[in-house]
Amino acid sequence: MAKTLVAYFSASGVTRNAAELVARAAGADLYEICPAESYTAADLNWRDKTSRSSREMRDKNSRPALADHPVNLQEYDTVLLGFPIWWYTAPTIINTFLESHNFAGKTIILFATSGGSGFGNTAQDLKRSVASSAVIREGRLLNGRLQESAIREWLSELGI
């Protein structure tokens, strides 16, 4: 039987709420991608060019360290991967997560939260961080008032 994991990164809690709803609707396990050093409000100030998030997103080779709480991906076929959109793509900690695990042969379906921007080239950007046999599919932006019934319909369309 195929097993699904919802893995997510949330700096402010918005993506956490969406991920919890997706996991509940999918009957999936939930895993939080945690940075070794939590983000503060100052770190997330996108208007400040010297803020931590601004520096990380400017440097495409930035790979923020993960907190030490591993997940065993071998038991999962599908990973629903959630994150906020930062600068029209995934935060670089998502690359850290992808590069820290073996996703060969797995399907990764993206979902994101955003204050206004879309996925852009996110799927293509992240493909560079996984084995060539991994499939990355752009999913949905989950913004505003989320309804579990709408999430279930989306998951059903995906075959989950």
Identify the role of each PLM range.
Residues 109-146:
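Short, glycine-/small-residue-rich phosphate/pyrophosphate-handling segment
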